[in-house]
Regions:
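Generic structural signal for well-ordered alpha-helices
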Residues: 33, 70, 91, 95, ...
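A generic structural signal for well-ordered alpha-helical segments
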Residues: 73, 102, 159, 211-212
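Glycine/proline-rich, positively charged
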Residues: 57, 116-193, 197-202, 206, ...
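Structured C-terminal cap/extension of enzyme domains
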Residues: 15-16, 20, 206-304
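Conserved, mostly hydrophobic/aromatic
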Residues: 36, 48, 81, 94, ...
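Short hydrophobic/aromatic-enriched beta-strand-loop microsegments
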Residues: 106-108, 189-194, 287-293
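N-terminal binding-site loop/beta-alpha segment at the start of enzyme catalytic domains
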Residues: 1-107
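A cross-domain feature marking catalytic cores of carbohydrate-active enzymes
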Residues: 47-52, 83-85, 111-113, 141-144, ...
């Protein structure tokens, strides 16, 4: 049986009831923040990813819960939202909702460039600006290394022109890690985005240490391992020692592991429900696990 996060929350397994008693608006300054190495600008360590639930929005009923998520996200101190042209309606939804809520200036918008060829890349960037309803995008990263050398050249030109602020590359596939590492060594990048989870620690072998050496910001995708982690802990309660790092749910257990890595700037879990938003942002509050506790978390998950 495949358990998902909703079922775990309904069952109350490993979830402190206190997370549902948090005020709708928590102090913005309570979120843990990390600095972007290239500029010193700080970001909350938990953001929002939009790859699935924002990708097939067709009606007002689809939009309404997402609008409430973004409204409360900003009110609770969040600002990093990650999207991509390949995520269906996601860029348009994010742009429209940000405009309606008048929160664009409060957001750090990140999107991706997944075209081949210079002209196609420029066209896609122009489309992203239009969809996001913004004259400038905070971060654009070459998506899964697609035509990376060509597109990074275009992105640098746009950065110099003030149309984007940060440049990077992304992957969510282990098979690309070697090429990813080579690109990190060859190019000056503000950010990388890579897959990393408590049950998928391969990026910690070479990519994350290299990011530290290169002074590159790190955004983490797939922090729940495509849902595998929630399935792995089905029927299990949080270990008592999770309280030592202010962890109240399995989602926080998984996210606090990620953002306690000293090289990680932020993680962007997919978030389309307010209850998940409140839970996820709990990972950006309180204590984080120390190195020894991180090893203990790894042993715990590996032993399931």
């Amino acid at each position: 049986m495949q358990w998902n996060r909703r079922e775990l929350l309904k069952a109350g397994i490993g979830v402190s009831a206190s997370i549902f008693l948090l005020p709708a608006i928590a102090p913005a300054d309570s979120l843990i923040r990390r600095k972007i190495p290239s500029t010193g600008e700080s970001l909350p360590v938990i953001g929002i990813g939009t790859a699935r639930r924002y990708a097939t929005v067709a009606t007002e009923a689809d939009r309404a819960p997402l609008k409430e998520v973004l409204r409360q996200f900003v009110e609770m101190g969040g600002n990093v939202i990650d999207t991509a042209p390949s995520y269906g309606t996601a860029e348009t939804v994010v742009g429209d909702l940000a405009a309606e809520l008048k929160i664009r200036e409060s957001l750090f918008m990140a999107t991706k460039l997944g075209a081949r060829g210079r002209d196609a890349g420029v066209q896609q960037l122009e489309q992203s600006l239009k969809r996001l309803r913004s004259p400038m995008i905070d971060l654009v990263a070459v998506h899964n290394l697609q035509d990376a050398q060509m597109q990074l050249g275009t992105l640098r030109q746009w950065k110099q022109a003030g149309r984007i602020r940060y440049v990077g590359i992304t992957t969510s596939f282990e098979r690309q890690h070697q090429e990813f590492e080579q690109t990190m060594k060859a190019e000056a990048l503000d950010f990388i985005q890579v897959d990393y989870a408590l049950d998928n620690r391969k990026a910690d072998r070479r990519i994350l240490p290299l990011a530290a050496d290169r002074g590159t910001g790190v955004m983490i995708n797939l922090p729940f391992g495509r849902g595998r982690l929630f399935t792995a802990v089905q029927g299990k309660s949080l270990p008592p020692w999770a309280g030592e790092f202010d962890c109240a749910s399995w989602a926080q257990f998984f996210l606090k592991y990620i953002v306690s890595h000293p090289v990680v700037t932020c993680a962007v879990p997919g978030t389309a429900k307010v209850e998940y938003l409140v839970d996820n942002l709990g990972a950006a509050r309180g204590r984080l696990p120390a190195a020894a506790t991180r090893r203990r978390m790894e042993r715990f998950i590996d032993g399931l």
